[in-house]
Amino acid sequence: MSIDNVKVDIGKAEIGFETGKLALQAPGSVVVTSGDTTVLVTTVANKSVRDGIDFFPLTVDVEERMYSAGKIPGGFFRREGRQTEKAILACRLIDRPLRPSFKDGFRCETQIIATVLSVDNENEYDILALNAASLGLQLAGVPLESAVGAVRMSLINDNWVVQATNSELEDSVFDMVVAGSLNPKGEIDIVMVEAGATDNAFAKIDEGSAAPTENIVADGIDMSKEFISKLIEAQKELVAKRDVPEIDWPIIEDYSEELKSQISEAFGSDIETAMAITDRAERSEKQSELQEQAVEKFLDEEEDNTKAIKLAFKSIVKNTVRDRVLSGGARLDGRTPTDIRNISAEINLLPTVHGSSLFLRGETQVLNVTTLGMSRLEQMLDTIDTVTSKRYMHHYNFPPYSTGEAYPMR
């Protein structure tokens, strides 16, 4: 098997993709590099669908290897441990923009594994892995609506910098990861934005740096499209060099368009009325009532198409809500796109803890509890990063009663 590669300049960074050298048994295998950071990304999809699968079984794993940073794992056994928080977040970052890009009805079990082989502590591996995963899926012949490209945009000294190094990020006020896909017109559609202020944001703004206003952030997103397009073109260039197999993948149809059309004709106006109810509980109850009526009306006892009816009904509800927002400018609870929920907060709820507060936004509540400790209680970190401890720890719990449901506590 020949080795093929392609390189692309993204700002000051050079990103290289190579295939045909490592993991030759994986249908989609890509080694991606930037600086001295190297990641192997493999993609494998089964050719058949498991019995009883009614969802798309996509898994993304990020494997950080301690040797990539020249370290030996801690602990008695000196073995690689469980995934770090950073690796878990990288998995989610890869999953979010890629999952919607698969063709509707594709249910074959698909696995993406990103193994960090080397890190230079200047070029982060997450964006590299995301782009390589998109490329690997194409090399494996998996049915995608479009390739996906992604970049990190950082607001440094009042200018947007693409793929900034970790040294440059120390002066950043605002960072965001922007992912996009190519639409039929050849333009970039943004499919994901993950953004947030940096640890140095307040200090930098106090020193005179521009705050990330809505217009500034919009400019950064718009600027990212050029680089996303270049990454997608690089992926296409490498795919064109390879003999990508044409596979007749099984595509599952959840429901027929005829069934959806019949349900829409019979219950479309009632669904529109139900979605205009601003009270959440009342709206949910009315939606369930209409769904039961749809099942009763269109049930085929010989085929038992209950599931198909419910999925078609759900699709109609989704389209109704979307159309209502786009055409009428009203969301489910009656707010316009620019309105926010009522916000309030209380403090000192609990008598013996160091600090407590209750934050409310609409019907959403968050109870926060703070505990202060000595510096020796810092969390020790055994990761590939240069940071070896963490003094601020934020634990998030989401019990089932938060959404009025009952299921096992994990």
List each language-model region with its residue ranges.
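A generic structural signal for well-ordered coil/turn residues at beta-strand boundaries
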Residues: 2-4, 26-28, 54-56, 147-149, ...
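Short glycine/serine/threonine-rich phosphate/pyrophosphate-binding segments
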Residues: 25, 124-130, 147, 172, ...
